[in-house]
Amino acid sequence: MPRYVVHVRTPMPPAEAFAFMADLNNFARWDPGVDDVDQVEGSGPGPEAVFDVSVKAVLGTMTLRYETTTYEAPKLFVARSQSTPLTSLDSISVRSDGTGSVVTYEAELTLNGLLRFVDPVLGLAFGRIGDRAAGGLIEALDGERVDSPT
């Protein structure tokens, strides 16, 4: 299963960084692979929030429905999308760092069914996709990439 992790030090206080990251409406602001986001349940981030995230795919656009599975403000947010071809798990953790915070964004992608046999190939492309998203995230958080959250 391809996995991508980035740690970003930002001047934003933890509550502000968490609120920005947990609102998936903001994905389109920082991830160039996201075309559009529509919230279909809830109002803003929260434990009941559900979002349709339209992402660029090989043959056009694919819409993934993300359901919030963990919401522990201002520290941890997890959203999961499961469809016939794939399962996506996005985890965001935030910890205090001086007057700012460190945001850790982790994305895991699992191909389902017979597609799981091409997971290694997807892993190669997923690294490049993750790097582009990380660049946008660093810019959106006015931050810098760090090697670890500690």
Predicted regions span which residues?
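Glycine-rich portal/gate segments that line the openings of hydrophobic small-molecule binding cavities
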Residues: D38-P85, V102, R132-T150
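Residues located in well-ordered beta-strands
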Residues: G33, R65-E67, S93
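Beta-strand/loop substructures that line and gate deep hydrophobic ligand-binding cavities in soluble
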Residues: R80-R132, P149
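Short loop segments at secondary-structure junctions
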Residues: P11-P14, Y71-E72, D97-T99
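Beta-strand elements of well-folded, non-transmembrane domains
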Residues: M12, A57-L59, L109-G113
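Well-ordered beta-strand positions in beta-sheet-rich domains
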Residues: V5-R9, T63-R65, L89-S91, E106
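Hydrophobic ligand-binding cavity/cleft-lining segments
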Residues: M1-E41, T150
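Amphipathic alpha-helical segments that line or abut small-molecule/effector binding pockets
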Residues: A15-F18, D131, G135
